[in-house]
Amino acid sequence: LQRAGGENNAYTTNDLTNYYCQLPAQNIETAFWLESDRMLSLAFSEKSLATQRKVVCEEFKEHYINKPYGDVWHKMRTLAYTVHPYRWMTIGKELSHVENAKIDDVKNFFFKHYRPVNAILVVAGNVKLEQVKRLAAKWFGPIEMGTKYERQLPIEPVQTEARKLEVQANVPLDAFVKTWHMDARLSPGYYAADLLTEILGGGAASRLYQTLVKEKQYFSSIDCYHFGSLDAGLVAVDGKLVKGVAMETAMQAVDEEIEKLKATKIEAKELQKVVNRTESVIAFEDMSVMSRASSIALYELLGDAGMMNTEFQKYQAIGIDDIHAYANKIFDNNNSNTLLYHAQS
């Protein structure tokens, strides 16, 4: 691929795996050849498995064991989820899961998921539709379709009481993480949740940053975000405390800001600001060909590639009352999970 002037990489989230190539349009067939070969006849061997196992084990140690705060989301996911697979990270719940991976496990997973019937192919750039159809038929047509994977994952039960975990770790500053369960990606509530996270923690103008970082100086940094999960995900508030600030003080301050949002409806101006910000993010994300291709693939996975051009209308339809109602729905103490990450003294 490099000799053809291109590059490739891949990533995996909790919901999908994305292999992607970038190369000159005149060499597009090289990408079809390589990706179809990967799907048709991936080379499985004990030697290659041992090599990749070692690489992933080192990645696990580097990012999740030896890195300060690296295990925060391992702990939070285990706290927040009881049955859904979101309860572990993509890389695995623990290092032993990677160390003990067997060749048959890898093969079975590959032939279950990496089949044409379960794949979405997006080609974006200076290409013609008929050219892409011809190349797809030539390179992927001969591969056995496989059996369609039906996503039937355990449904996480409604949380009925608050959960809390306190840990001591070798980190420079205390950290506070709190999550609440939110709606799935295609639910109407998803858009209200997305705007709520912007209101609370979307940058330096957000409520949490203005009050708890700039004004009260309880946190050195604080964010509010969600993961865009296909199934019901989490809204998270995540912050590092200023040295010397008591955890109880910081925790209470976050709760007070949440209660303000629940008690008093936001003004139209504040809502319009985060809607405009969301529109800008969507527009800028799709400026590059690679980002556009990834967006098309994701929306097709959601069921309709055309949503790429229409989804923003769902944000525009969210009103002040919707934000107020959704804040009161999810920011329930019984729906919360709190991780208090104490720096060892």
Regions picked out by a protein language model, each given a short descriptive name:
Residues D322-A325:
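Mature hydrolase/peptidase catalytic cores and their serpin-fold inhibitory cores, especially
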Residues L1-M39, D71-S96, N118-A124, D174-A184, ...:
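M16 family metallopeptidases and their MPP-like homologs
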Residues L1, P188-L200, L208-L212:
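Active/ligand-binding-proximal structured segments within catalytic/core domains
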